[in-house]
């Protein structure tokens, strides 16, 4: 991770960024789960399928959770696919700007994410984050920081089953 990389440069003190300046005073945690189902343009190989995200969304909706889908306009097709399969999911692309996204994460109980940039911001909230990633040198060396980041990896992210994610969710939200 980043701390190990800094140690190789003989930098032994690491200060976790304080993002509290991004918050407004109205932080009310509710039964919502944030999904980050996208990845960068060149990161298609990092994406867990829309179908699997939708299956997890259905599971959570049955347990009375709201599902907020976040990302950029590049993720609109993915988000629409999830909404088509789980219409109760809520498109929050317009609240995915960095200054809104951190606040949104702080009001959630859980964040489910691919290996993508916003996952690192989500990790800094110290909320429970399930990070779905390929098991390779890059993801092993650069994963989200945070005390509650739960890494689920496979040699190919597409091989990670819905059951594995649901089992982890059950452990976290019990």
Region spans (language model):
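Catalytic machinery of carbohydrate-active enzymes
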Residues: 1-174
């Amino acid at each position: 991770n980043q701390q190990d990389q800094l140690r190789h440069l003989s930098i032994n003190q690491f200060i976790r960024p304080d993002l509290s300046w991004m918050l407004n005073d109205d932080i009310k945690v509710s039964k919502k789960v944030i999904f980050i189902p996208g990845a960068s343009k060149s990161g298609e190989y990092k994406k867990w399928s829309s179908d699997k995200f939708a299956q997890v969304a259905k599971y959570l909706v049955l347990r009375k959770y709201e599902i907020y889908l976040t990302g950029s306009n590049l993720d609109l097709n993915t988000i629409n696919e999830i909404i088509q399969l789980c219409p109760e999911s809520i498109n929050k692309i317009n609240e995915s700007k960095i200054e809104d996204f951190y606040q949104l994460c702080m009001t959630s109980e859980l964040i489910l994410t691919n290996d993508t940039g916003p996952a690192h911001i989500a990790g800094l909230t110290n909320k429970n984050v399930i990070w779905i990633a390929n098991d390779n040198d890059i993801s092993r060396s650069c994963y989200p920081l945070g005390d509650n980041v739960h890494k689920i990896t496979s040699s190919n992210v597409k091989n990670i089953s819905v059951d594995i994610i649901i089992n982890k969710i059950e452990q976290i939200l019990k």
